[in-house]
Design a protein with these regions (language model features):
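Acidic, Mg2+-coordinating active-site environments of NTP-dependent enzymes
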Residues: 123-126, 150-153, 157, 172-264, ...
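ATP-dependent carboxylate-amine ligase catalytic core
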Residues: 12, 36, 40-44, 48-51, ...
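Nucleotide phosphate-binding/pyrophosphate-handling subdomain across enzymes
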Residues: 52, 148, 153-158, 165-176, ...
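Buried hydrophobic packing segments
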Residues: 71, 75, 138-145, 280-288, ...
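Beta-strand->loop->alpha-helix junctions that form or flank phosphate-binding loops
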Residues: 86, 212-213, 227-247, 267-272, ...
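Short functional linear segments
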Residues: 1-60, 67-78, 85, 121-128
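ATP-dependent carboxylate-amine ligase
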Residues: 2-15, 25, 170-172, 193, ...
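Active-site-proximal loop->helix
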Residues: 88, 92-115, 186-203, 209, ...
Length: 459
């Protein structure tokens, strides 16, 4: 058999899928450190696998996940093989890395994790410090797509911001900036202009960019950045428009008007914000069809939009009592939720269970959601950065006199399982129960209601 090399004889550092996920998650204490030096070094050491892939880069405060779902489903329906990289995940760590809407096999994740362990250890010993959990996940995603499954295109979601986000290591064929709002202000800045500048950081020289951004100050930032990069900008309200034709509890119909043609289509994702997301995605697909020779037939595109589903976004998880899950976690998300609930679901009383993370814009969120709530159940997600339920109650109490219904009932229950039981018992036949505030809470509640035993939930 011949002599084996020392490398072949050396035992693998990780021996199971669980060990691999634990190792990756164990990198979390190094935190979110914006900067591309570590991922650039990793890509260099791996032979630049990212250069062998075509990416659609998606950034934005809200709507990234839903937009990625629309893109993936519709491109699949049109016959393309699609890689998808998203975060956070709802059920399992493998949800982050999908090929043709199927999670990465646990064996492949283990193999790729073992591949990058020595690299991570090497970089950890330099002045750059250890790669973070998100950097390692991103490297694994690139290796999976470039060396194992070879998709025609990769739908590529930013983790945080854009300019200094790890995913910005790639040069895409088209970029999408869904919208801009107040989130992660500790990292991205506390004005719309500052946040817009971070998101606009994904705009690359000569690469077309689509956006549904609406604030005038954000539009100015995008136009300036795109012009400086000689990147064609397709802006909702200027280069493309949409009209909502109808809406009910099952679906919405839209009319899209773009620079190349018009089209009517239907989506089953609920809420007015999903119409904007869908219109932005339709514009991205039109760019691919018009300039990059993608073969996208009308009927297949319409089928793709109509069949797109994304867990935890105005998701009816149970009919009796009627319970809805929604991952809204910032003021803009709360505004969309407050508008969408009465529109999509007729109800007598609204009972809302919420838990949030500590680093969110809590008052802005509450101002949007409190006016429509009859019973508010405050709880805590099972996550290290959770907001204390009593502290959340104090914020609600400050706003109660001016923002809430006069007879609002507030319950504080730290244990989310007990809070869920309370929500179920309060929600009568004509009522609506909603769980919201963070995807980390949604994930646990969803797993409990669907009796999923393999839920891992997390970043």
């Amino acid at each position: 058999m011949g002599d084996r090399t020392e490398e072949e004889i050396r035992p693998l550092p990780l021996n199971s899928y669980t060990e691999a996920v634990d190792w990756i998650n164990g990198l979390l204490p190094f935190g979110i450190r914006p900067g591309l030096e570590r991922i650039e070094l990793m890509m260099e050491r791996l032979g630049h696998p990212e250069r062998r892939l075509k990416f659609i880069h998606v950034a934005g405060t809200n709507g990234k996940g839903s937009s990625c779902a629309f893109l993936t489903r519709t491109l699949r329906e049109c016959g393309y093989h699609v890689g998808t990289y998203t975060s956070p995940y709802i059920t399992k760590f493998t949800n982050r890395f999908q090929y043709d809407e199927v999670d990465i096999p646990e064996t492949a994740l283990l193999e790729l994790a073992n591949r990058v362990v020595p690299l991570v250890e090497e970089i950890a010993g330099t002045d750059l410090g250890s790669p973070t959990m998100f950097e390692v996940s991103t490297a694994i995603a690139i290796l999976y797509f470039a060396e194992i499954c070879y998709p025609d295109v990769v739908v590529w979601e930013t983790g945080l911001g854009g300019r200094m986000d790890v995913t910005n290591i790639v040069t895409p064929i088209v970029s999408l900036i869904t919208n801009i709002g107040y989130d992660h202000m500790d990292v991205l800045g506390d004005t719309i202009e500052q946040i817009a500048a971070e998101k606009a950081g994904i705009i690359k020289a000569g690469v077309p960019v689509v956006s549904c951004v609406e604030q005038p100050e954000a539009i100015t930032v995008l136009k300036t950045t795109a012009a400086s990069k000689h990147a064609t900008l397709y802006l909702m309200g200027e280069q493309f428009h949409y009209e909502r034709l109808s809406v009910d509890a099952k679906e919405q119909q839209l009319h899209f008007k773009g620079p190349f043609r018009d089209m009517d289509f239907t989506i089953r994702m609920l809420g007015g914000h999903q119409c904007k997301n869908a219109a932005g995605v339709m514009m991205v697909l039109e760019v691919l069809r018009q300039y990059m020779a993608f073969q996208l037939e009308d009927e297949q595109m319409q089928d793709g939009f109509r069949t797109t589903f994304w867990a935890g976004r105005l998701e009816v998880i149970r009919e009796e009592p009627r319970l809805v899950l929604d991952g809204a976690h910032n003021p803009e998300g709360a505004a969309s939720l407050a508008q969408s609930l009465p529109e999509a679901f007729p109800y007598r009383k609204l009972h809302l269970m919420m838990g949030m993370l500590a680093n969110k814009h809590h008052q802005g969120y509450l101002k949007h959601i409190l006016p429509i709530v009859d019973t508010l159940i405050l709880t805590e997600p099972d996550f290290r950065r959770k907001m204390d339920a009593e502290a959340l109650y104090e914020l609600v109490a400050e706003l109660q006199g001016t923002e809430a219904k006069a007879d609002l009932e507030i319950i504080v229950e730290r244990d989310w399982r007990k809070a869920l039981s309370l929500l179920e018992s309060r929600t009568e036949r004509e009522d609506l129960g909603v769980v919201t505030g963070t995807l980390y809470l949604i994930s646990d509640v969803r797993a409990a209601l669907l009796h999923q035993t393999d839920s891992e939930k997390g970043w």
